[in-house]
Structures are given as C-alpha cells and as structure tokens.
Amino acid sequence: MSKLWGGRFTEEAEAWVEEFGASISFDKQLVKQDIEGSIAHVMMLAKQGIVTNDEAEKIKEGLQYLLEEAKENKLHFSVEAEDVHLNIEKMLIEQIGEVGGKLHTGRSRNDQVATDMHLYLKEKVQDIINAIKQLQKVLVDQAEENIETIMPGYTHLQRAQPISFAHHILAYFWMLERDVNRYEDSLKRINVSPLGAGALAGTTFPIDRAYSAKLLDFEGIYENSLDAVSDRDFILEFLSNSSMLMMHISRFCEELILWSSQEFQFIEMSDRYATGSSIMPQKKNPDMAELIRGKTGRVYGNLFSLLTVMKGLPLAYNKDLQEDKEGMFDTVKTVEGCLHIMAGMLETMTVNKENMGQAVTQDFSNATEVADYLANKGLPFRQAHEIVGKLVLHCTKKGIYLLDVPLETYKEMSPLFEEDLYEVLSPYAAVKRRNSAGGTGFVQIEQALEKAKILVGEVTRN
C-alpha cells in the first residue's frame, strides 16, 4: 500500500522491515486518546479558519464514528499503516474522502503521540490512585478489627518489641498514602498539552494551542516545542512512582508469605488467593502474594528500560522513542492487577490472633520495658541496658523468659526492681504504654485510624 508519507521514496520497504518498524501491535491501545486528540485538533483548526466549519464537522463525525467502532472492537488495524495514528487517518480518509487528509494540518505524529500518552496517563494515574484508595480502605477495616491484637514487632527479622497488629497494618497505609501523593503530584506534569508543537519547531499555521489544550482538559501547554516532543520524563516519573508503589506492596507480600507459613501461622490466606501442589496434597501456597512480589521486578525493569533508552537521545524525536510505550502499558496493567489482588487477599485473610499473642509471650521483646522501667527510676539508660542484657543471658541459659524470673533474682541485678515490675512485663501493657505520637499505643492507633478514614473518604471533617 502507498504510505501517507511516501512522496519522497521510490522503493517499497521490505515486508519484514515494515513489521519490525511498526508499532500498531501495541500502540493501538491509544486509539481512544488518538481520536479524542484529533477531534480537539480539528475543532481548533476550524476556530482558527485553517479548515472550514463544514470540513471540520465532516472530519469530526468521521472520527466519532471510528471511536464508536473502536469501543466495539470493530476496527481493523494494518501493519502497513505502521501505527495507530496513520491507521486512524487512513480509515478516516476511506470513510469520508480526501477531506480527511486535512486533519493533519499543523500537526506532526511527534506531538500527536506525545499528546496521546499524556491523555492516557492522565486517565490511568487517576485509576491507579482510586485502586490504592480501595486497598487503603481494606487496611483500615483490618486495622479496626485488630487494634488490641498483639504481635511481635521485628527488626532484622528478629523479635524486637510487642506491637499492635493494627499498627503494623497502618504502617503500610501511610506508605500507600505517600504513593498517592506522588501520583497526584505527577498529574501536574502529565496534565500538560504538547499538541501543536509540530515535529520539533512549531508550525507556520496560526494555531491556538491553548484552545486545543482546553478542549482536552489540559491545564496548560508545553512552553517549548522541542521539549514537548523530545522528553518522556512524565512517563519515567510514572514508572518511578509505580516502582515505589510496587516495592511497598511487595514488602507486605513478603510478610504475608512468612506469616502464612507453618513457622509463623499468624494468618491464613483464603483459598481464593492460594494454590495447591501437583505432587504434595497438603500444600496451600501463597501464590498470589508471590506473584505480586515477582511482578515488582517487572515494573522495575520497565523503568530502567526507558531510562536506558532515553539516556543518549539527542533532541528532538528519535525512533528509539517507539520503545516508550510497551513498558508504560505493561506497568499500568501490572499495577492495577496487583492492587486488585492485594485488596482481595487482605480482605479475605484470617488473622490468627491467638498465635500472634502466644508468640509475643515466648520471647524477650519485653526487654526494652525492663530497661525503661529502670530508667524511669533514675538509672542511666545505658546502665539499665547492661543490666537487662545480663538478665536476658540468664534467662536463655535457664530456658525461661523475663516474666518467669523471680523478684529475688531481679533484685540481685538491681535494688531498683520492685513488685510493680511485673505490671510492665505484660505484652499488652507494653503496647498500651507506648503512647507517644505515632506509636503503637491503642490511643495513638485510634487517632491514626480517624486520620486514615478521612483520607480514604469514610468520614468527613467537622
């Protein structure tokens, strides 16, 4: 077939070269955005008198017809037409005649594709924000049910101090809230229109870029035409934000995997989010959590792939930039899927409160309470730390825990120990007493939950 750009050429490209250079297999995902951008462009052309109102109306009707066909998956794309832009333009000309060729007046595929991707990410970032909010609501619900569920808190994967399970869950809530903030902030840079920048230098036609930007609900336009068509930092920022989000939920998945093991038995996954073994009939594997953990590397890879593509590109457009889309599409699909699975997995899991509580009574995670007890009685904390360290060593040799040590033994270590010591050794008491701002104390958790509910829209401010 003849190319829409073929006037300069005397030879046809090899079929395999066309296939290698074509992007229609993946950029057809931008068909909605491409048509919407074209409608705004032709309306601007009519406003500026570059095409007649009748021509614009005919082109607009043709584009709207193609958009409806696209929604019903009735469009047939061809490799010969290379990409979504030329496919749509070819279909438009076939639909309404040669007047369809006026659509591309004052525009290049360079600013066209950049516009498409800005429109695409503007929509998808908001979808991801909404999905994060749904996951946050699940975390709030689980936290409310587990304010007084006591579990070991860990450092170095060693039991450190007793905490509320709700406190642990809410840690991820606030990580996700920062992810939301990053995505929201990125919209300032995504919601800018490159349309009208042309190939690189603008156009001689008297276009109105601000008008087409307004029609597409952009907040502004790129100030430099070279910048508008050359950079993909808005995609890189999206991939970076998505990588951080995936890192957060991957860490949570790692803990869910550990907690669901026989060694912990803190939670049990719903059968809906687990699988079995083809050989071992007893197995219940946390495959969905493992897949999310694995797919995190995939999202990281998409970020580093585009960074590597971009690092040596001179201005303005280069064909290398065709490689900017597949990683973007893949990341959107991966992130949305992982958030959906994560919410369902957390909503349906069973929390084994008894096992968590039992675990925290069979360790030395209350040792800090003993050191704080001595410090509150005036002993320098470093001396208190030394004394409690010796007490722990004594207990490990005897095979007992701090609650099992008789008062006489405590007094041998320090005369400051009194009967009231045993009141602070209880894990429940230890958690309740940690009432500093942001701590695991029950009052602090309830306050944190109120803030969290406001953020996810469950309650309104007075």
From Swiss-Prot:
Gene3D superfamilies: Fumarase/aspartase (C-terminal domain), Fumarase/aspartase (Central domain), Fumarase/aspartase (N-terminal domain). One of its GO terms (cellular component) is cytosol. InterPro entries: Arg_succ_lyase_C, Argininosuccinate_lyase, Fumarase/histidase_N, Fumarate_lyase_CS, Fumarate_lyase_fam, Fumarate_lyase_N, L-Aspartase-like. This is Argininosuccinate lyase. HAMAP family: Arg_succ_lyase. It comes from Bacillus cytotoxicus (strain DSM 22905 / CIP 110041 / 391-98 / NVH 391-98). It is an enzyme of class 4 (lyase). It is found in: Cytoplasm.
